[in-house]
């Protein structure tokens, strides 16, 4: 008996918010740093749409393949003065970036017995830069941050008993334009 199952779906999110910094307290107030002084204020909007198809096909009992296919559209808009303390210098956002991602994942599962399973998968995933990546790269000498791309290969073994589960997962992750916490490319 061969089994096939599939799920199709989509999602849409829109975020809109003002980002601001306000002086809450200073020991010795000066002109630009009086309590309640707003030292930056900008608006950011993010639209995130995705559509996906997940499918599984069982070739023979215990051996199945799967495919997850995702399309993702992301638009980021930021306008206005930025947090100079975080960015280490004063600047204003004038940003309108659009990203189109295709994120596929393919794999095999082989159930040797009810207790033992082997699996392997390959995936490509993308991630857009976040606010801090832009803030830390808004120097004229630095490149604007690019979307991150990850190629991920995994193989593993899983043992599942009534009251105990153990597994071994080996993976290789290869990044291009990795976005690290400092915002560096």
Show the residue positions of the predicted features.
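Extracellular loop and loop/strand-boundary signature of outer-membrane beta-barrel proteins
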Residues: 1, 32-42, 84-95, 136-144, ...
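Short sequence motifs at beta-strands and strand-loop junctions characteristic
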Residues: 1, 39-47, 59, 77, ...
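Face-selective signature of the C-terminal outer-membrane beta-barrel domain
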Residues: 1-83, 111, 167
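Transmembrane beta-strands of outer-membrane beta-barrel pores
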Residues: 12-18, 71-75, 122-128, 137, ...
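Hydrophobic, lipid-facing positions within transmembrane beta-strands of outer-membrane proteins
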Residues: 47-53, 102-106, 118, 151-155
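Membrane-embedded beta-barrel scaffold of Gram-negative outer-membrane proteins
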Residues: 111, 117-125, 146-185
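Short acidic, glycine/serine/threonine-rich loops at helix termini
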Residues: 131-133
């Amino acid at each position: 008996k061969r089994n096939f199952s599939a799920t199709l779906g989509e999602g849409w999110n829109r975020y809109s918010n003002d980002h601001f910094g306000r002086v809450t307290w200073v020991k010795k107030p000066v002109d630009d740093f009086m309590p309640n002084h707003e030292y930056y204020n900008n608006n950011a909007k993010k639209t995130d749409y995705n559509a996906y198809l997940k499918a599984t096909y069982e070739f023979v009992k215990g051996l199945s393949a799967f495919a997850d296919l995702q399309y993702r559209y992301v638009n980021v808009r930021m306008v206005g003065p930025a947090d100079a303390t975080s960015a280490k210098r004063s600047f204003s956002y004038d940003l309108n970036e659009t990203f189109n991602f295709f994120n596929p994942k393919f794999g095999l599962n082989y159930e040797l017995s009810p207790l033992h399973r082997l699996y392997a998968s390959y995936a490509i995933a993308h991630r857009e830069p976040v606010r801090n990546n832009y803030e830390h790269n808004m120097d004229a000498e630095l490149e604007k941050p690019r979307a991150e791309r990850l190629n991920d290969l995994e193989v593993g073994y899983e043992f599942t008993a009534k009251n105990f589960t153990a597994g071994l997962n080996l993976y290789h992750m290869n990044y291009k334009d990795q976005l690290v916490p400092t915002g560096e490319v």
